[in-house]
Amino acid sequence: MDTKLLLCDCAGSQPLNSDKIGSACEMECSKVFTALCTRELEAAAAEIQQGDTIIACGQEQEVFQALAEELNVDAPGFVDLRDRAGWSDEGADAAPKMAALAAEALLPQPVTPSVDVYSEGTCLIIGPGDVAFALAEKLAVTLAVTVLVTDEAEPMSRAFDVVRGRIKSLNGALGGFTLQLDAFQQLEPGGRGAFAWTEVRDRAQSACDIVLDLTGDTPLVQAPAKREGYLRADPKDPLSVERLAFEAAQLVGTFEKPLYVRMEETLCAHSRAEQVACTNCLDICPKGAITPAGEHVEIDPMICAGCGECAAVCPSTAITYEDPPVSALLSRMHILARTYRRAGGAAPRLLVHNAHGAEMIRLAARFGRGLPADLIPLELSVISGFGHAEMLAALAHGFARVDVLLSPTTERDALDRELALAQAIAGANALGLLDEADPDALSDVLYAQDVPQPLADPVLPLGNRRQIARLAAQALNPKAEEPLPLPENAPYGAIAVNTDACTLCLSCVSLCPSGALIDNPDKPQLNFQHDACLQCGLCKGICPEDAIALVPQLDLSDAALSQQVLNEEEPFACVECGALFGVKSTVERIMEKLAGTHPMFASSDKARMIQMCDNCRVNAQFQQEDNPFQSNPKPRVVTTEDYFSKRKDH
């Protein structure tokens, strides 16, 4: 059954063109209702019972969900056309945007993989005794509480355990915290008078499901506000402590933890042969969820909060974001741009935002100017992982400009870096970050923007993030004859080799994690493939001659897909057998430095061995007169002829 869109003009407050919306997004539209959530609720019920219905209302979702539950049918879908398009100073011209938003609502929602987290309610409270003991008394009814007291206070209740110690490390998240303590002591329950304590010992280990930090000191984990199961409160603020007790009591049971990112270890360029190369994700992760693990990195899914910054800055696409996947995000941008043009729009703009931005848009629509008719909002759960590949892809899909609306809690490190990279490829006037906290100010900025011309022939970039960025960059720079210069730390580029210093030892080839550096098995030659280079810097770091320099740039020509010779020389011919080996200039340089000067090569015969291949060198070594491994000559084999020759009568 085809999906039907129920339209409502919200008491006549917005203009709706059902014919244009329906034809552009290829969906049946109802007549335009006026009070679908109140007086015309029976009409809504009749349509919901038909199934496959989307209601153009974001404000009254709960009303229609309750109605569907009462009718014992599946809840309808929802799309907000009013706040994002209809309530606007340009609402009369917003039909193309409404069609685009309606078409986006038809797309299937991707399912994020997840894992179950189990919390049995084992709780550790850390803090001074007067506050920690009172909180433990309340929580002991529902949780298994242990108090790590930080002062000399002693409990008057045995409803919970009490220990002393100094936390050396705390790792993990909800349902799986592990900690190590020094100066650890346990309470001795027996005896009269004050409680006694066990002897002090170090390196004690323990585990718990929930950690309540009442110390008021530096947090024990990175990004404490995003570490699930780790709760903090100011011990001097009774209200925050009470709130902490309520939150902790809810953290018992089975929870669903999304697996935000996927790691492909074989693609990771973190290190090779114990030489560290790429550390982008390690440097930018705000939660400390990423740790080195040999030649690759590991991501702890229990600690990861899903900001997506690691995926945005990963040069090899070893880390990919799954909430949503890049393919699903590209599908949304594609359908928005295509439907907008199909409905008669010309130069759409894209505003990427999160839940905070959605609330600003609603406030601007209700009390201010709303959004311009050519500005299409795209809501994401997190925006910090919206990288240069996604920005370029949006422009390649046909958007004239792309802006990311920041929120007060948005991590900006990756966004700033990715924006600079995208602007170097597409130009500064087509991309930007908006840091506005006032809805009216946001509207003023959006209405005053200069809108550049969009791509005349939009393309559909596919593949991984590197492939998407390259295809989009080619579409945006069709006349680029020279490589585009990029900012430092860009994931694309070339290497410059000082041929005078390079000895063609090829150590860089053996360690290059992406295979951008290639040798030639037939002759001394160093080849390079531009599009495979990650600019990880491993070749530069391990080059014994310091002959390599990184050149961040993006070569959009076809030559970037083939091998280019960076350095080559003639091989040396063995003076004994003529076999080719080594590098001619290197062998000659060694002869110049060692022949006649080094004790091992003092004579001409010994110096000549430098000019031999490996087989001839071994033979010459064993045939020389002063060979230290040489023994007496083998005795000649005695034959019958010898016996005959010794007879006197013969």
Per-segment meaning from a language model:
Residues A35-L41, V297, I383-G387, L526:
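Short acidic loop-to-helix transition motifs that present clustered carboxylates
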Residues T266, E309-L405, E545-H650:
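Flanking helices and flexible, charged tails adjoining ferredoxin-like Fe-S electron-transfer domains
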Residues H296-G306, V497-C502, Q525-Q535, Q563-Q564, ...:
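Flexible gly/pro/ser-rich segments immediately N-terminal to CXXCH heme-c attachment motifs
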